[in-house]
């Protein structure tokens, strides 16, 4: 059996009791570290807490070479751990399909997701979000405009946008970097983004949430990762009041 377990957003305490029990009963435990990481803990602490060895997976291990995972699931109980929820803003549906095609039973144990956390921390109503996007670190001759196109298309439809910020090995994009990259993409055009909301360390005891113009957010110390960015559309009255009270938003 292959069991997908969501670890939640921040630290060891975010996992559900069901998820913890699944780990204890597992014959093999895999941890993917490329879609999200729990910055409130370490892999060593996780191994100690769970009493299990964790097999660390990179993107290519899951998307291109999943055979060790599937073999473990054929021979016993394999648990696949991921930050957040296993099937939200991930490509893990493909792994579940592969398992099903090989006759391997599967199960999902959900975890708290950044998608619901964003709505809770910002007060932006969840049904008003459009397509999300991701901002990658640019590479030589590669600086995709897709994130900006997605944001502008959502704004035209009066929809909010969740903007995921790049996660690389020992490198985590900040709110400031994300805004600066969007501004570079808008250079020489008439496009503009009047309002941003930056969030840091969702799920922790002291998350940072700040709303305002790009100039204001560049002055905010968001602190350590993980960060995420939101571009709101026009605000409903309750949304505006929420941001005023909990994100320091000043519409003036």
Swiss-Prot record:
Annotated EC: 2.1.1.98
SUPFAM superfamilies per UniProt: Tetrapyrrole methylase (SSF53790)
GO MF annotation terms: diphthine synthase activity
Reaction equation(s) it catalyzes: 2-[(3S)-amino-3-carboxypropyl]-L-histidyl-[translation elongation factor 2] + 3 S-adenosyl-L-methionine = diphthine-[translation elongation factor 2] + 3 S-adenosyl-L-homocysteine + 3 H(+)
Pfam families registered for this protein in UniProt: TP_methylase
Spans traversing the lipid bilayer: none
Keywords: Methyltransferase, S-adenosyl-L-methionine, Transferase
Superkingdom classification of source: Archaea
Keyword Metal-binding: no
NCBIfam families referenced in this protein's UniProt entry, alphabetically: dph5
Family indicated by similarity: Belongs to the diphthine synthase family.
Name the record gives this protein: Diphthine synthase
Organism: Methanospirillum hungatei JF-1 (strain ATCC 27890 / DSM 864 / NBRC 100397 / JF-1)
The encoding gene: dphB
